[in-house]
């Protein structure tokens, strides 16, 4: 709530936002304390398997899953917005334009599964996937209103293929890193990263987009009320946007695209972090 409301509903330095951040931090500390000292439960029945943090390889693989999820969900969230704002697509058509990313993501997952099952080597797949994803993220960051659809498709294919190479791989790898009786908890550990990371990251990148676009528009067009700007950002088909001059509309769209591009800074960072971490992975085979 603090991230979503900050800068839009309430100023970042307002009491409401500060209070929300304080409450969130307190709840995290309370949860960690309860898990560390097993308050009201036993170490074996804790909701979060903290003992896995002592296993370096398992921790690395979990972080890599966080990165893979970020690399997948951010473009899936932002690309349809780009096509709806810039190309004036309907929601359905904007979703259709995601097919290049989704198809190559699925194909990459299948190919990765076949080859890793055959030879057991997983480190090269992490490295190659992260390199492709990082390149795709960097290229998507350069997209503007004049970028052709073909280029956007190509960039999304790069990030989809790269993410597909290692999106599901951690679930197989962790099973070779723990005893058989700990496999369910290890899979849960990775699943937490898979679901938790994009939940937080999407809130962050959406806040960055809305704040960047809102502030840029407000600074350049002081005559447009802040409430009207928020209405415009809710969809280019709004009456408020349609009433503006065409030159003003194009300038606002440029600010919106610049705001959307901020999200790819996070994916580039995720790709870079994952690329570095992959260099420290075991180069052997699973279950060797």
Where do the PLM segments sit?
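C-terminal membrane-cytosol helix-exit motif in multi-pass small-molecule transporters
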Residues: 1-8, 23-40, 275-281
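Transmembrane core module of solute transporters
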Residues: 13-26, 30-33, 37-185
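Membrane-embedded alpha-helical segments of multi-pass transporters/permeases
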Residues: 29-33, 106, 110, 138-141, ...
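Helix-loop junctions on the cytosolic side of multi-pass membrane transporters
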Residues: 33-42, 145, 211, 215, ...
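Hydrophobic alpha-helical elements at and bordering transmembrane segments
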Residues: 53, 63-66, 192, 252, ...
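Transmembrane-helix exit segments and adjacent C-terminal regions of multi-pass membrane proteins
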Residues: 237-288
């Amino acid at each position: 709530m603090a991230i979503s409301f900050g800068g839009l509903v309430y100023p970042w330095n307002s009491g409401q936002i500060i209070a929300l951040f304080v409450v969130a931090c307190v709840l995290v500390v309370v949860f960690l304390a309860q898990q560390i000292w097993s308050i009201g439960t036993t170490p074996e029945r804790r909701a979060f398997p903290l003992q896995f943090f002592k296993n370096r390889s398992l921790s690395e693989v979990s972080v890599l899953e966080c990165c893979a999820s970020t690399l997948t969900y951010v473009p899936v969230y932002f690309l349809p917005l780009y096509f709806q704002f810039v190309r004036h697509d309907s929601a359905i058509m904007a979703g259709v334009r995601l097919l290049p990313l989704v198809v190559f993501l699925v194909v990459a997952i299948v190919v990765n599964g076949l080859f890793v099952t055959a030879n057991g080597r997983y480190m090269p797949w992490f490295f190659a996937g992260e390199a492709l994803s990082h390149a795709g993220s960097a290229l998507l960051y350069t997209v503007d209103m004049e970028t052709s659809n073909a280029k956007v498709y190509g960039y999304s294919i790069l990030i989809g293929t790269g993410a597909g190479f290692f999106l599901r791989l951690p679930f197989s790898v962790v099973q070779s890193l723990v005893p058989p009786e700990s496999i369910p908890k290890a899979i849960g550990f990775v699943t937490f990263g898979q679901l938790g990371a994009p939940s937080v990251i999407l809130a962050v990148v959406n806040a960055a987009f809305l704040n960047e676009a809102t502030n840029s528009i407000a600074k350049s067009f002081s005559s447009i009320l802040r409430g009207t700007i928020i209405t415009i950002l809710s969809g280019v088909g709004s009456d408020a946007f349609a009433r503006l001059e065409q030159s003003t509309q194009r300038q606002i769209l440029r600010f919106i695209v610049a705001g959307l591009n901020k999200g790819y800074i996070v994916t580039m960072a995720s790709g870079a972090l994952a690329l570095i971490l992959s260099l420290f992975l075991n180069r052997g085979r699973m279950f060797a």
